[in-house]
Structures are given as structure tokens and as C-alpha cells.
Design a protein with these regions (language model features):
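Short, surface-exposed connector motifs at secondary-structure boundaries
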Residues: 2-7, 27-31, 118-125, 182-184
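Active-site gating/metal-coordination segments in enzymes
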Residues: 6, 11-108
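Distinct, well-ordered alpha-helical segments
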Residues: 17-24, 43-51, 71, 100-118, ...
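Glycine-rich loops and low-complexity Gly/Arg-rich segments
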Residues: 33-36, 55-60, 83-86, 114-116, ...
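Glycine-enriched alpha-helix->loop->beta-strand junction motifs that scaffold or abut catalytic
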Residues: 53-58, 78, 84-88, 119-123, ...
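Short, flexible active-site loops
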Residues: 95-98, 121-124, 153
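H/E-rich (His + Asp/Glu) clusters that bind or coordinate divalent metals
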Residues: 124-126, 131-208
């Protein structure tokens, strides 16, 4: 209310049941995404339960934190449930964490999603943070797969660590002229409590 936010999305929350409890406190403002290991035997059932019984609205993964390729067939039942329930899938690719974090992993390249996105054209996949340093690959993925969108959230400080004179303004322009506004999801981002809403992320994007 302080910042005039109409809704807040939570994509991790210490387990699906715990996140559902948090969302239930302000169901008109809070939106939760399930977040659990996709390769487990019961992962598809857990996702269905999280959506149908707990009321969560999507599925979130951190690709560089997984111990198998994102396209591993073991996760296909999960993608099938995403298609069945018509829920969006938010998958973080690119560098992970702050300084000293993960800069290389078998799942760090957004193009790793190519085959999954092709196999499940009815699922909306979202790559956050403009691709988080993997700009070219994210654009190529979006070119090949019309069911892939991007979001703009985060500080996007990674632009200082890539080739080229990138700024948030230039990123907006590049994605606007390639994939179009309808596939760009505006977001701000934050992290663990008690940090709260990072208003400066909002102001940076409005300015640019």
C-alpha cells in the first residue's frame, strides 16, 4: 500500500505450503509460484497440488541451481502439467547471485530451454532479468519460440560485466524492437525479508 502496488508476486517461499500460507494472508494482493525440484518422481503431482489445492499460480526454477540439464525428459511430466493447467513458467538463466556467484553451469544459457519450449508450445515460459547477461541467446530463443517472453526485473547491474555499452534503456529498446511490448513483462524485484520492496529498481526503469 505504501508504494501503491496492486499485486506482489512471490516466486520462492520456503516450500510450496509455506508460500501458500503467506499468500493466503493477502490473497487479493499476493501471487505465489510453486518452486520445487522438477526431476523428482512426484514433481508433477506436487505442481498440480500446489496449483489446484494451494492456489499457487505458476512455476519457478533457478536453472543454474539444477543438477541435470533443463531438457532432461524426467521433467517432461512437469511441463505437461503446466500445459494442462495453463500456468506460466519463470526460469532464471544467466549469472546467479551477487559477486562470487555462479558464472558458468550447464543450464546457464537460455538457449537450453529451446527444445522444451518447442515441445510445449502452449506453455508460456518467462526468462527474467532480460536474460541476465545472455542477451544474444535470449533474443535468439525468443526468435525461435513465440511462447517465450522476458521480464525486466532486478537491478540489472550485470550490464557492467558484459561486452558492449548496455544500459537498461538500451535493453528496453532492443527487446521492444525485436520481440515487441506484448512479450515484455515489467517487473522490479527484491529478495529476502526484511529488505522489502526495492523502489530504486522501479525508479530506474521508469526513468529509462
Amino acid at each position: 500500500d505504501k508504494y501503491g502496488l496492486r499485486a506482489v508476486g512471490f516466486v520462492t517461499g520456503g516450500g510450496n505450503d509455506n508460500l501458500a500460507k503467506i499468500v493466503s494472508k493477502y490473497p487479493d494482493k499476493f501471487i505465489g509460484f510453486a518452486h520445487h525440484y522438477p526431476f523428482a518422481e512426484g514433481a508433477a503431482d506436487e505442481l498440480r497440488r500446489s496449483v489446484k489445492e494451494l492456489g499457487l499460480k505458476g512455476y519457478k526454477l533457478l536453472a543454474p541451481m539444477l543438477d541435470r540439464p533443463i531438457e532432461d525428459p524426467a521433467a517432461y511430466p512437469v511441463w505437461e502439467v503446466c500445459a494442462e493447467l495453463d500456468i506460466p513458467v519463470l526460469i532464471h538463466f544467466g549469472i546467479q547471485g551477487g559477486g562470487g556467484g555462479i558464472a558458468w553451469h550447464e543450464n546457464i544459457n537460455p538457449l537450453k530451454l529451446h527444445n522444451v519450449a518447442k515441445d510445449f508450445p502452449d506453455v508460456t515460459f518467462v526468462v527474467p532479468h532480460f536474460g541476465c547477461a545472455w542477451i544474444r541467446e535470449t533474443l535468439q530463443l525468443c526468435w525461435a519460440c513465440g511462447n517465450v517472453s522476458i521480464d525486466t526485473c532486478g537491478s540489472n547491474q550485470w550490464v557492467r560485466w558484459v561486452d558492449g555499452d548496455w544500459t537498461t534503456k538500451k535493453l528496453f529498446r532492443k527487446y521492444m524492437e525485436t520481440i515487441g511490448a506484448e512479450r515484455i513483462i515489467f517487473g522490479t524485484d527484491s529478495s529476502y525479508f526484511p529488505r522489502g520492496f526495492a523502489e530504486r529498481y522501479l525508479q530506474d526503469q521508469i526513468r529509462d
